[in-house]
Amino acid sequence: MESIIDTEDTIAAIASAVSLGKGGIAVIRVSGEEAINSCKNIVETKSKYAWESHRVFHGFIKDNLENKFIDEILITVMHSPNSFTGEDIVELHCHGGVIVVNKVIETLLSNNTGVRIANPGEFSQRAFLNGKIDLTQAESINQLINAKNLKSAEIAFNGVKGEIKKKIDIIKNDLIEQLSEIEARVDFEEDFSEFNYNDFSRNIKIIKEKIKILIENSKRGAHIHNGISIALIGKTNVGKSSLLNLLSKKEKAIVTSIPGTTRDIIEVNLTIKDIPIKIIDTAGIRETDEYIENIGIDKSFEMIQNSDYIIYLYSLEEGLNKDDEKIISKIPQEKLITILGNKKDLIDSKKVNKKNLSNSVLMSIKNDEGEKELVEKIVKKCGSKEFENIDIFLNERQISNLTDCLKNLNDTDPIIANKLPFDLLSIEVRDGIKNLSRITGQELTEDLLNNIFSKFCIGK
């Protein structure tokens, strides 16, 4: 693709996570025409492999302006075009931690006039513009970096390998074949028999089914990326925060005996039996005059509507009362995983009234008792089978383009039904192809491109 954005500058950024005050190794990536020369200005080395492509060699960072050494490093060099960006790349592997890393970056910039800090996603943007990756691969890299569970990472990596582009190209080639026949008939109509609207309709229907399956799988795949949301709903001080901590195996929420402690929504992503789950701890529901707490309670009722599933908690010590039943009545039954009675350790479970509680679980969250039964109910309700055949999923932008393509193909229906001039079909098919090309990045505006890559991290 011809570059529509200036890529003449040499850019630099931290390409690894840096811990505040400590860290093992940090990587500073430099890419561009002056990448090698700019690094030569601040690196002293005696290695015989220095500055050869695809070599790692030892050296020291030196600030020539202050005439002092900064750090001992390893240097990796990749010459154009055999690099991620397609440009010359140098990666400086220095000791981690904010102080050292910032000083290396400062030294690189102050000792060279032609180097600047990279914009978010600019390395990936250059890789795309230089034809090293297509747009779906670039976006999949970002999904991989931001994956919240292993399944999401696996699917994102399929996109990095080019699997999204493969599926889009199959659909695109099918449409190009249909368009080619229409245009050939327009140019050489006398050489063809009468146009068969039924055959065309049949072929378009097959293509539309492929698109619908891809859209549906992508929507299901969003659950993998974000996690199936399960909201913990109940009155105050019934153990919602304790359950969140139990399932996540971490102290994510404050646990006290003071009612109304949780006022903000707390989310934890985890995997249960290979199912990506997002557990949401909500504010306890009760009558209160406190303004801030009421905001949290309002959010709890919102989560009843917005979450995929719900676990309702109540205290066995108090029993399931009319207030609980009133809240439960607001929960769509298809969303309800279970009604969980907590604090089993404080009562005689034989005396619990289980009327209308066939779907209940009795637990002592404090003593880790009943977790296995709860997990079984979560797995049964959420299931993992719906994810078995998902190998890729498209993001919102890609789904939007695919949906627009589907609309183009649906717009051929009245043309076919009324047997209007068949050359009108070419308009819709061509627009459909353009929408598919937008997915892989062949039909772009500069603003759209900048918007996509601005959502990436700076070092990528």
From Swiss-Prot:
Protein's cellular compartments: Cytoplasm
Cofactor(s) this protein requires: K(+)
UniProt cross-references to InterPro entries, sorted A to Z: G_TrmE, GTP-bd, GTP-bd_TrmE_N, GTPase_MnmE, MnmE_dom2, MnmE_helical, P-loop_NTPase, Small_GTP-bd
The keyword Nucleotide-binding appears for this protein: yes
The protein's name in its UniProt record: tRNA modification GTPase MnmE
Biological role: Exhibits a very high intrinsic GTPase hydrolysis rate. Involved in the addition of a carboxymethylaminomethyl (cmnm) group at the wobble position (U34) of certain tRNAs, forming tRNA-cmnm(5)s(2)U34.
Family membership: Belongs to the TRAFAC class TrmE-Era-EngA-EngB-Septin-like GTPase superfamily. TrmE GTPase family.
Coiled coil: none
Enzymatic class: hydrolase
GO molecular function: GTP binding; GTPase activity; metal ion binding
Keyword Hydrolase tagged: yes
